Amino acid sequence: TGSYNTFVGTSAGKGGTTSAPFSSGGNNTAVGYQALTAFTVGDHTTAIGYQAGKAQVDGYDNTYIGARSGQANAVGDGNVTLGDRALYSDTSGHRTIAIGKDALHFFSGSGTTDFQSDITKIIAIGYFAGYNMGSVPGGSWPQATRSTNNIVIGYYAGNTHYAGGSNVVIGTEALNGVPNYTQGSVYIGESSGQNVSSGSYNVAIGAYTGRYATGSYNTFVGYKAGTGGTTSAPFSSGTSNTAVGYEALTGFTTGYGNTAVG
């Protein structure tokens, strides 16, 4: 019953309130089968693609472009998604950008795993970027730590980052290898921090930097700097190390407080 809506496609903008006063949202655009089909009072949302924004009830200022993008987001606002199944499982996240196929796919879920459904202020760009971000295996993770204020850019970048905020991850398969929790870290470069499981407040810049380093407070700059000498779990757990230069400190395992330059 709202005004200034444009709906094109079977069940597009159908409305989730099936009795009076029906669905009163306005200024919405939905194009595609079941796009924005459940809306009630939401407004200023654009959903283009098969089941795009399908579950949105009263969110606003969202843009969903791509088949099933933002499909489960019921009450979130200020989200931008572009790509097949981008932001697919999120139910209430807001002010998030997901660009690329399956970017930020698992923001929430069900089954034997405990998932966080309120993930905010994330930018994920790339194929499968941040795919598992926000899905937290029960019992073994800091449940109170939200996946907020993260930036992940690149093919499979941050794909296995489950929890923790204020991270910057840029590069093909950076921070992607084992389920991980990290906070306040920067990983830039191909496979940088690829197997980090729990380290926080690290800086790793350069291809393969900190690839097998799971400790905290490390700084690695340069090709393969601080890669880590233990290449299988539990990997290299040394902390508070600084390595600058080509393959500097590349073989460290449990070292603490080392500085290697050159």
For every predicted segment, state its role:
Residues 1-262:
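Glycine- and small/polar-enriched repetitive beta-structure motifs of secreted/surface proteins
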